[in-house]
């Protein structure tokens, strides 16, 4: 939709009203005319009204002309016997509240420029109201933050009606401030809890908005004093929770646990699990509290289970969590479809990581090597070029499994003891089998696959082959590589020159036949 700037006359009128209110309290009623512009149906006029309100109440907050303390009702204050200054401050603070309420409504305006300007103005008021509090401190050095106003801002972002992902991305610029980040986590936790308590079925839009905001919150990894505040204070106190990283971690943990305890759509499950290992677990006060969520996700199956294993592995490896079924879950994910899923590269990267320990029992590694080899028989070439080096790496790490490569007294192929239907790798009898699948793949039609499968015909080198460059290999890339191969300038031909069709020396045909 085409936008037209507000007319010069309307800007001049708003400027005149602004100057009148700031110059003389006798002209205070002009505030109503300024606030009325916020109700306009023209986005350009609303923007001018928001800018005017920003300058007006920003100046009044700096001048400390708003009532401080528990705000009485407007009628009670005006009917009382207090002085004119008291009544004016109460009255102007009520107008300030009316302005903030309207700005909160504008966060849902259909025009993004209006929403963005309303957000910036509200955050400006948060900063000014924090520097010049509208409530009296309960004790000396009491930490004051405009929680009520800030809750309205975050509440305007986490709504079930509108997708605010773009507006939230602009709000995320404020999350670099320690106090904004801390209070955002607290307020978001409260809003999500209230939304789910009021209605059993929460809209997908609210969950998407919540995830967009939550995933943007990041904490420092190292313990440090937090002093980068959006609301400036003359001096900070060690008694304030907002200055301690451990309190931020507690708030971060409560926020995510409050989000993940609800039934989420599969699309959000995947997004959360993708971010779990590097954006969520490192910042939790007690990472092991995620075990219930991750084990439940592991039981879902498919890509959800695949992504949940990474978080479980971190809990096992770094936090000494016991989860005996981990490798059985991983083994169960190995089926023919794994070569065609969206997260194939991520899965095999993680599988390589999970199987990297040299302390794993030989029977377990043998089961994975055998399952991968069996799946390789029907895998596409781009997957084979990744899987075959992975199998060889498993044999390099675990010499006890190399018996599977060459077993002179092994069973016939039709009597392979390996049971591909067994879900428990310990009972699959893979170590009694052999990797005949790799010898079969040496006859593959693609020369690179045949070459990769032929590596087991020789002594395996000590250094492993990195599969990282092969994880995201595609059929298109293989085709392009084949096209770019340079052929030798001279093609090798027969070394004895031909003299006619039957012209070779000692050719029996020339002795008994004559072509004439």
UniProtKB/Swiss-Prot annotation:
Localization per record: Nucleus membrane; Nucleus, Nucleolus
Principal subcellular localization: nucleus
Transmembrane segment boundaries: 296-316, 347-367, 375-395
Topological type in the membrane: Multi-pass membrane protein
Alphabetical keyword list: Membrane, Nucleus, Transmembrane, Transmembrane helix
Keyword Metal-binding in annotation: no
Alphabetized Pfam families for the sequence: CBF
GO CC terms in record: nuclear membrane; nucleolus; nucleoplasm
InterPro entries: ARM-type_fold, CCAAT-binding_factor, Noc4
GO terms (BP aspect): ribosome biogenesis
Family: Belongs to the CBF/MAK21 family.
PANTHER family: NUCLEOLAR COMPLEX PROTEIN 4, NUCLEOLAR COMPLEX PROTEIN 4 HOMOLOG
Name this polypeptide is given: Nucleolar complex protein 4 homolog
């Amino acid at each position: 939709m085409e936008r037209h700037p507000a007319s010069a006359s309307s800007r001049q009128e708003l400027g005149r009203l602004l100057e009148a209110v700031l110059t003389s309290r006798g002209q205070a009623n002009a505030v109503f005319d300024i606030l009325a512009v916020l109700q306009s149906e023209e986005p350009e006029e609303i923007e001018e009204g928001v800018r005017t309100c920003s300058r007006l109440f920003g100046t009044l907050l700096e001048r400390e002309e708003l009532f401080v303390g528990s705000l009485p009702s407007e009628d009670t204050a005006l009917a009382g016997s207090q002085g004119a200054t008291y009544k004016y401050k109460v009255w102007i603070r009520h107008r300030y509240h009316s302005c903030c309420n309207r700005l909160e409504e504008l966060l849902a305006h259909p025009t993004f420029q209006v929403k963005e300007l309303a957000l910036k103005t509200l955050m400006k008021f948060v900063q000014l109201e924090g520097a010049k509090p509208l409530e009296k401190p309960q004790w000396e050095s009491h930490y004051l933050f405009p929680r009520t106003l800030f809750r309205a801002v975050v509440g305007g972002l986490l709504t079930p009606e509108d997708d605010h992902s773009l507006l939230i991305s602009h709000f995320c610029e404020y999350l670099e401030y320690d106090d904004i980040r801390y209070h955002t986590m607290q307020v978001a936790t409260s809003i999500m809890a209230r939304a789910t308590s009021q209605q059993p079925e929460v809209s997908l839009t609210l969950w998407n908005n919540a995830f967009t905001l939550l995933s943007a919150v990041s904490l420092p990894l190292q313990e440090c004093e937090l002093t980068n505040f959006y609301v400036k204070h003359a001096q900070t106190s060690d008694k304030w929770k907002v200055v301690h990283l451990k309190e931020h971690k507690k708030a971060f943990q409560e926020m995510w646990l409050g989000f993940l305890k609800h039934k989420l759509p599969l699309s959000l499950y995947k997004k959360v699990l993708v971010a779990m290992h590097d954006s969520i677990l490192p910042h939790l006060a007690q990472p092991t509290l995620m075990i219930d969520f991750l084990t439940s996700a592991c039981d879902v199956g498919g890509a959800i289970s695949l992504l949940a294993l990474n978080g479980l592995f971190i809990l096992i490896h770094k936090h000494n969590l016991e989860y005996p079924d981990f490798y059985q879950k991983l083994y169960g994910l190995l089926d023919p479809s794994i070569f065609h899923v969206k997260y194939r590269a991520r899965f095999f990267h993680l599988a390589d990581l999970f199987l990297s320990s040299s302390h794993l029992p030989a029977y377990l590694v043998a089961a994975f090597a055998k399952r991968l080899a069996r799946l390789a028989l029907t895998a596409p070439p781009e997957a084979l070029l990744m899987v075959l080096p992975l199998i060889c790496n498993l044999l390099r790490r675990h010499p006890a499994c190399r018996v599977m490569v060459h077993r002179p007294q092994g069973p016939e192929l039709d009597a392979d003891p390996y049971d591909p239907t067994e879900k428990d790798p310990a009972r699959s009898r893979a170590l009694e089998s052999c990797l005949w699948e790799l010898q079969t793949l040496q006859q593959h039609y693609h020369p690179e696959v045949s070459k990769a499968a032929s590596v087991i015909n020789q002594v395996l080198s000590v250094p492993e082959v990195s599969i990282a460059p092969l994880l995201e290999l595609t059929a298109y890339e293989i085709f392009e590589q084949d096209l770019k191969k340079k052929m030798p300038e001279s093609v090798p031909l027969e070394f004895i020159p031909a003299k006619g069709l039957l012209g070779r020396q000692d050719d029996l045909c020339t002795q008994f036949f004559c072509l004439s």
